[in-house]
């Protein structure tokens, strides 16, 4: 592989007209003495890794020619004119820009990873939107009716069954009095087979119309004005 070296940026550089037109001219910088080397590479080796020997320090370089491909010498001669010569400073700038230019060409030919939709993007596109959560009011816990409420309810039903013409207000008043005067019934202290012991209590004013019936108070008339609890 033929080559010519350039000793320093300030020295004159020979025109590479003596290279074969069937080969490709590339410029490589020696990593030991920093000399610019003009390398004549055959077209069959443009995309291979070749070994270049520096003509100044005899250092061997392993060069990947894919990143050092530059226009052919005859094309550079036509662009620069018949009496123009290569400037080493321009060659250094071209060498620095060659890898970036190659990367730009590769990026234009092949899509980047950012252009390829990821699996997460496809999953998000086909994902069914979830319904917003509904703020349900807290469920009200059903309270167990107390012994008093159960007794009053059952007592009102019993009084109305014995006297259908009685009003609900009078039945409630009688049921409340039965609850107050017979506390032993509340806790089941008396068995069902034993008779209920009646309590001898003096009747107060306003209770003349109340009569004892089966151990409970019950109104004697339907028009008794008693205020419920």
UniProtKB/Swiss-Prot annotation:
Which keywords does this Swiss-Prot/TrEMBL entry list? Developmental protein, DNA-binding, Metal-binding, Nucleus, Zinc, Zinc-finger
Q: Tell me which SUPFAM superfamilies the record gives.
A: HMG-box (SSF47095)
Q: In which tissues is it expressed?
A: Expressed in abaxial regions of young lateral aerial organs, and in primordia leading to cotyledons, leaves, flower meristems, sepals, petals, stamen and carpels, but not in roots.
Give the GO terms filed under biological process for this record: abaxial cell fate specification; cell fate commitment; fruit development; inflorescence meristem growth; meristem structural organization; polarity specification of adaxial/abaxial axis; regulation of flower development; regulation of leaf development
Question: Residues annotated as region Participates in DNA-binding?
Answer: 120-180
**What outcome is documented for mutating residue 56 to A in this protein?**
Loss of zinc release and reduction of multimerization
Stretches annotated zinc finger (C4-type): 30-57
How does the cofactor bind to this protein, according to its record? Binds 2 Zn(2+) ions per subunit.
The protein's superkingdom reads Eukaryota
The protein's location, in the record's own words, is: Nucleus
- Identify the stretch(es) annotated as Involved in self-interaction: 45-107
- GO cellular component terms, semicolon-separated: nucleus
- Report if keyword Nucleus is assigned: yes
Respond yes or no to whether keyword Nucleus is given for this record.
yes
When the coding gene is removed by deletion, what phenotypic consequences does the entry describe?
Leaves polarity and growth defects.
- Cofactor requirements of the protein: Zn(2+)
Task: Give the Gene Ontology MF terms in alphabetical order.
Answer: DNA-binding transcription factor activity; transcription cis-regulatory region binding; zinc ion binding
Kindly give the InterPro entries that the UniProt entry links to this protein. HMG_box_dom_sf (IPR036910), YABBY (IPR006780), YABBY_C (IPR056775), YABBY_N (IPR056776)
Q: Which residues form the signal peptide?
A: none
- SUBUNIT field: Monomer and homomultimers (more than 20 subunits in vitro). Interacts with DNA as monomer. The release of 1 zinc ion from a monomer disrupts the binding to DNA and leads to multimerization. Interacts with SPL/NZZ. Interacts with SPEAR2. Binds to LUG and LUH; these complexes promote adaxial cell identity in leaves as well as embryonic shoot apical meristem (SAM) initiation and postembryonic SAM maintenance.
Protein family according to the UniProt entry: Belongs to the YABBY family.
Chain's role: Involved in the abaxial cell fate determination during embryogenesis and organogenesis. Regulates the initiation of embryonic shoot apical meristem (SAM) development. Required during flower formation and development, particularly for the patterning of floral organs. Positive regulator of class B (AP3 and PI) activity in whorls 2 and 3. Negative regulator of class B activity in whorl 1 and of SUP activity in whorl 3. Interacts with class A proteins (AP1, AP2 and LUG) to repress class C (AG) activity in whorls 1 and 2.
Question: What's the domain remark here?
Answer: The non-canonical Cys-56 facilitates the zinc ion release from the zinc finger domain.
What name appears for this protein in its UniProt entry? Axial regulator YABBY 1
Species assigned in the record: Arabidopsis thaliana (Mouse-ear cress)
Q: What is the lineage of its organism?
A: Eukaryota, Viridiplantae, Streptophyta, Embryophyta, Tracheophyta
Gene from which this protein is expressed: YAB1
């Amino acid at each position: 592989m033929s080559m010519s070296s350039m000793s320093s940026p300030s020295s004159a550089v020979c025109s590479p007209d003596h290279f074969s037109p069937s080969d490709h001219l590339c410029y490589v910088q020696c990593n030991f003495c920093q000399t610019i080397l003009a390398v004549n590479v055959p077209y069959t080796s443009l995309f291979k890794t070749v070994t270049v020997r520096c003509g100044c320090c005899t250092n061997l370089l392993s060069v990947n020619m894919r990143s050092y491909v530059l226009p052919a010498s005859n094309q550079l001669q036509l662009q620069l004119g018949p009496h123009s010569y290569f400037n080493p400073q321009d060659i250094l700038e071209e060498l620095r820009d060659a890898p970036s230019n190659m990367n730009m060409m590769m990026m234009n030919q092949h899509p980047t990873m950012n252009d390829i939709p990821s699996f997460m993007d496809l999953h998000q596109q086909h994902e069914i939107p979830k319904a917003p959560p509904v703020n349900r009011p807290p469920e009200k816990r059903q309270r167990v009716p107390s012994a008093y409420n159960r007794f009053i309810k059952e007592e009102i039903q019993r009084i109305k069954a014995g006297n259908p013409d009685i009003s609900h207000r009078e039945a409630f008043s009688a049921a409340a009095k039965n609850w107050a005067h017979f506390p032993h019934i509340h806790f089941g202290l008396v068995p069902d087979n034993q008779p209920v012991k009646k309590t001898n209590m003096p009747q107060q004013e306003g209770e003349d119309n109340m009569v004892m019936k089966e151990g409970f108070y019950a109104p004697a008339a339907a028009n008794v004005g008693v205020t419920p609890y």
